[in-house]
């Protein structure tokens, strides 16, 4: 496997392979010969939490593959209104499509936990104000738990196809479980909790709301032309919390090609 700071590329030949972009930014991907059809999954970045008495949490960024697939980022929590971050959604305009929305963050009536990232066939778990978090569905991430004083981060979602959904975090609090082999959300440092990769929303503290999880969208049988260059955008996690301790996880984009490979789960692992 070839690895570079911003993406991971593997495959036995140009007719079968995959590439994953996992660092926030904009990339140019050249379609390899003789590839004429690909499947793509995009995950939006998770939303951040407020900096107390200073600013709102930032929204997570959208992730996209050309103009074909877009997964929206989770919303940042609002400092002035106390509104929780909304879960990310998304759009697809080509191919056999699917995906779920991110879970909304927990409200500010306690200290809201982060929402889980969307799954392949269901939504991420919604954040809570106090108590155990909610499990994700369809391979999505679970939301963090909340003690009522601090909320944990939402779980992210993996890129290798649909797997088990993430469990909700405990009221200790612990972060939501990652769905489809994604990463669990972070515990709370006292200044906030990080979302789990990819797309988990941040957990809050001091009576603030949590960030929303990023949405997931996939498309299959997307027609491409060898040698053409396609823009790939990976959305950043929304920053927030004191010293950025309450930042959502970044999004990601993964492209696969080869015979009989399609999301959510047909030969979607690395080949």
Where do the model's predicted regions map?
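Generic detection of intrinsically disordered/low-complexity segments and helix-coil linkers/edges
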Residues: 1-2, 15, 23, 114, ...
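GGW-centered surface loops in extracellular recognition modules
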Residues: 10-46, 269-271
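Short, intrinsically disordered N-terminal pre-domain segments
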Residues: 1-11
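Low-complexity, glycine/proline-biased repetitive segments and flexible coils/loops
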Residues: 6-7, 37-271
